């Protein structure tokens, strides 16, 4: 995928099993000028990524049914076509080890729930301008 396509895509993949959180995230993403592809579990996010790499970013809940956010990130970092997609990990867990695991796996930013609109918008903007999303996970 060319860098021109990378910059022009306006879609963000959102995976969270909480319907209220999905609505919250989607509404803010829309206000920021992006379209959302929204799923309620990790397995569905994985299926989408297997056939569609045209996303500006991914926002994944840490704990979801079937496949966790960390597993999605690990998969993305093994696929060259997905490595350019920056990822925000969100979690209700306030655990520094969990945060560290997210960054080691390849997350670009980490946001702990609960968060407010301003916190999410700021983190989203950081995510969308981050140029280090293509880093590879150490083997």
Predicted regions and their residues:
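Charged docking surfaces used in two-component/phosphorelay signaling
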Residues: 23-31
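Short hydrophobic/Thr-rich beta-strand motif most characteristic of the beta2 strand and flanking loop
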Residues: 33-40, 48
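Active-site beta3 strand of CheY-like receiver
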Residues: 53-60
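Short, glycine/charged-rich "phosphate-handling" switch motifs in NTP-dependent
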Residues: 108
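C-terminal output helix
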Residues: 115-124
